[in-house]
């Protein structure tokens, strides 16, 4: 069951915008001025008839003094004045996906997550995702991010999608607004947030952030900025312009780390499918003398748009794999998309990026913290090879009560759009019941493998403790740590991925089997060393 609040009707509009003379804007914002190419974007797209004043206010002061910036709307309601169906669908709440559903419970995706992932901040709270309209609110609220600084004004607001869209601070309050330091405000919390991790929650600061978050005299914020102040500056989750160019309406990506991977590093849109990468390309377009950049897609591709967030990426400090030194937010590697599937991931982290997220609290093994790698999992899957995109299942074409056909922006599981609008479009000989049955068969199978991999990881850690206590040589422990690193990545990848392996069940099974094998090989090394150590001790008696 889903629900939402309609803010705009078919004719819907907020107060009329004050129009401006677009030619005055074009005098500077052409392909030679400081806001290069804006004119070219505007005149060639379907927004050519939309006046600049629709999205930009306080323009008179800007015309008088270039250093006085106009106010640019980042609120989805601005787009909703024309795109009412898309906007209202974004506000929908999936009442069947409860908030604050912890993954690390006996009935969750991973019952022993806290044991296996100590001392990482995710052990404080690691919840299942819910409707996109809440993604900023949920980030600010999570126990691992701000030490409990930001709290709900009332639990009654937890499901108010319209209030969340209008601004996160309609729902949340700051426990200590007179300070801006990261600290614990309650027990069992962490202060792990930083500005980079918020850029897939909100791009309200897109005009105040230089490419890659590097320090820049024109940028208000960078990777090292005070994260509390940065958080307070945000209001809206998943802005429309993240995927749609506001001037030309062309499909685009705005996540700098993704543009870096595809264009700057030359890895392409589909690194495991070179021919597809040649067909679907990204053109890097720089603005304001290279201050920031966007990536224009050669054709609409919802996989690339969704991959701005539904992807594994570094967004935190870590450890340099070559030197062992601390990697701080000043290092560009703290804003990094590895753009790799699970089988190449650890190798690339060590060889290409020389980055380790943290070390296990018990074994000391190098650990890579995985974030929602839906895109990498989808690469090479049967569905991806068949031409299916994220939108086909999660944002299908719908028809409103008024008969208007539109793309749903209620990003949710196929079930809640109606299987007849998703799975049955291709599987036209199926019933909705069969689609649901098949989906759950795959998810149940993979969840079983996740739990088996988890069991063997826990056994590895427990055996490591016994071995270390008995005085097993460090040379053996060092070798076992390598197995632990591999096993952990190939387990947590699927804990972090949000389809329970449905996006690529064959890869999920192979990867999780590899995790189990790595754990078992590590255990075998330890058991052998334990037996040898016991014999050596017995000889001394």
Labelled PLM ranges:
Residues 7-541:
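Short sequence/structural segments immediately N-terminal
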Residues 1-6:
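Bacterial N-terminal signal peptides
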């Amino acid at each position: 069951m889903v629900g939402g609040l309609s803010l705009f009707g078919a004719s819907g509009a907020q107060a009329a915008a004050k129009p401006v003379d677009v030619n005055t804007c074009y005098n500077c914002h052409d392909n030679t001025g400081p806001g290069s190419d804006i004119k070219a974007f505007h005149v060639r797209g379907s927004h050519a008839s939309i006046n600049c004043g629709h999205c930009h206010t306080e323009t008179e002061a800007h015309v008088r003094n270039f250093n006085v910036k106009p106010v640019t709307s980042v609120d989805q309601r601005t787009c909703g004045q024309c795109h009412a169906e898309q906007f209202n669908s974004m506000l929908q709440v999936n009442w069947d996906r409860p908030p604050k559903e912890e993954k690390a419970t006996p009935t969750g995706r991973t019952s022993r997550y806290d044991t296996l992932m100590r001392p990482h901040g995710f052990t404080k709270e690691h919840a299942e995702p819910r409707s996109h309209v809440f993604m900023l609110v949920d980030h600010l609220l999570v126990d691992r991010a701000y030490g409990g600084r930001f709290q709900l004004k009332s639990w009654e607001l937890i499901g108010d999608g319209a209030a969340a869209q209008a601004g996160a601070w309609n729902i949340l309050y700051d426990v200590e607004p007179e300070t801006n330091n990261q600290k614990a405000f309650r027990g069992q919390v962490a202060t792990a947030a930083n500005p980079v991790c918020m850029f897939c929650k909100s791009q309200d600061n897109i005009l105040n952030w230089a490419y890659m978050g590097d320090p820049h005299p024109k940028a208000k914020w960078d990777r090292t900025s005070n994260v509390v102040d940065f958080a307070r500056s945000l209001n809206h989750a998943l802005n429309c312009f993240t995927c749609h160019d506001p001037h030309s309406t062309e499909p685009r990506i705005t996540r700098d780390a993704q543009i870096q991977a595809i264009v700057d590093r030359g890895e392409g849109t589909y690194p495991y499918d070179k021919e597809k990468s040649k067909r679907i390309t990204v053109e890097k377009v720089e603005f304001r003398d290279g201050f920031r950049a966007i990536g224009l897609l050669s054709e609409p591709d919802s996989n690339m748009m969704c991959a701005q967030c539904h992807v594994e990426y570094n967004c935190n400090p870590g450890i340099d794999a070559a030197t062992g030194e601390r990697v701080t937010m000043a290092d560009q590697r703290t804003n990094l998309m590895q753009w790799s599937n699970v089988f190449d991931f650890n190798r690339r982290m060590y060889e290409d990026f020389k980055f380790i997220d943290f070390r296990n609290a018990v074994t000391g093994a190098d650990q890579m913290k995985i974030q929602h790698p839906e895109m990498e999992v989808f690469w090479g899957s049967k569905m991806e090879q068949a031409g299916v995109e994220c939108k086909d299942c999660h944002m299908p074409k719908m028809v409103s009560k008024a008969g208007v056909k539109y793309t749903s922006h209620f990003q949710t599981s196929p079930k809640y759009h109606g299987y007849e609008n998703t799975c049955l479009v291709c599987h036209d000989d199926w019933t909705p019941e069969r689609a649901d049955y098949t989906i759950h068969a795959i998810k149940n199978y993979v969840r079983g493998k996740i739990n088996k991999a988890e069991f063997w990881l826990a056994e590895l850690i427990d055996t490591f403790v016994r071995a270390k206590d008995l005085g097993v040589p460090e040379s053996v422990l060092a070798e076992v740590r390598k197995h632990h690193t591999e096993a952990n990545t190939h387990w947590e990848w699927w804990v972090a991925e949000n389809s329970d392996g449905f996006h690529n069940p064959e890869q999920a099974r192979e990867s999780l089997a590899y995790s189990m094998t790595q754990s078992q090989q590590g255990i075998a090394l330890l058991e052998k060393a334990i037996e040898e150590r016991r014999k050596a001790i017995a000889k001394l008696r």
